């Protein structure tokens, strides 16, 4: 998989932001287990005094232009958006090899992954303009896996959205802990997520009595929302404009169900 650099991605993301929003951003330091983490907060200063919050978890490349752009896009839509830092301050992979190594630490230690996402959720909930009972979490690739783990931990969030995330779980019985609504947006031709993994997730969610949706996009592979992934499906990860547009709309509609007062 290609490492996300963010140039084309950021331009595309920001082009769709509402023009009248006044988005304010800042870097936020917080901690988990003695590690210093550095997230990115975005809010619309022209909006209501209190708003729903959206936690965003990055792909394997860490906090960078792409996830920051998504945070700004969500802020312009009226949410307080916080891009979590799972890796830690200063850990910003520069190559695919470095990104794979960083992500592997958390993929192989789901307890640590959950702790890092929970710390970011707590930081978002501390923001004075966030409606504490109206929070959703979204994630891309590695981050999609992370928000599903957040749900499996029993976290008090309204919903989670996984964009082309890994769907495997070493503890499928934890599906019974899920209180959030779940939306999984998946590339039907993603070679990194076998059909058996999709089926196992469906069984897990059914077994837990979860309110869930799984949408598969034909012709889409891994990283279908990330323009910098390129256009060659044969590499297993590639941008798909239609799937990007449709999956974002699916998320927007999902949020409208979660937060009807914010419409």
Residue ranges and their predicted role:
Residues 27-129, 226-238:
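Serine-hydrolase catalytic machinery in alpha/beta-hydrolase-like enzymes
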Residues 40, 206, 211-263:
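C-terminal catalytic histidine-bearing segment of alpha/beta-hydrolase fold enzymes
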Residues 70, 194-204:
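Short alpha-helix in the alpha/beta-hydrolase fold that links the catalytic acid
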Residues 129-140:
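Alpha/beta-hydrolase fold nucleophile elbow
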Residues 139-143, 147:
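Gly/Ala-rich beta-loop-alpha elbow adjacent to hydrolase catalytic centers
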Residues 156-166:
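A conserved short beta-strand
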Residues 184-186:
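Short beta-strand/loop motif that positions the catalytic acidic residue
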Residues 189-193:
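Acidic catalytic loop of the alpha/beta-hydrolase fold
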């Amino acid at each position: 998989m290609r490492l996300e650099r963010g140039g084309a991605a950021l331009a595309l993301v920001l082009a769709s932001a509402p023009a009248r929003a006044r988005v304010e951003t800042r870097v936020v330091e917080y901690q988990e287990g003695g590690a210093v983490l550095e997230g990115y907060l975005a809010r619309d200063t022209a909006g209501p005094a209190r708003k729903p919050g959206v936690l965003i978890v990055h792909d394997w490349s860490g906090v960078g232009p792409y996830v920051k752009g998504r945070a700004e896009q969500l802020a312009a839509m009226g949410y307080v958006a916080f891009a979590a830092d799972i890796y830690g301050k200063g850990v910003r992979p520069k190559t695919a090899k470095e990104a794979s190594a960083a992500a592997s630490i958390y993929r192989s230690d789901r307890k640590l992954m959950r702790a890092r996402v929970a710390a970011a959720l707590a930081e978002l909930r501390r923001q004075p303009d966030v409606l504490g009972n109206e929070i959703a979490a979204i994630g891309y690739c590695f981050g999609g896996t992370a928000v599903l783990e957040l749900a499996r931990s029993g976290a008090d969030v309204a919903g989670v959205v996984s964009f082309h995330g890994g769907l495997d779980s070493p503890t499928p019985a934890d599906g019974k802990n899920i209180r959030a609504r779940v939306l999984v947006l998946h590339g039907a031709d993603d070679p990194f997520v076998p059909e058996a993994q999709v089926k196992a997730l469906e069984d897990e969610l059914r077994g837990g009595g979860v309110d869930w949706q799984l949408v598969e996009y034909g012709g889409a592979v891994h990283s279908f929302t990330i323009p910098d992934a390129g256009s060659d499906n044969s590499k297993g990860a590639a941008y798909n404009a239609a799937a990007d547009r449709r999956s974002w709309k699916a998320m927007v509609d999902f949020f409208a169900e979660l937060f009807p007062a914010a419409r």
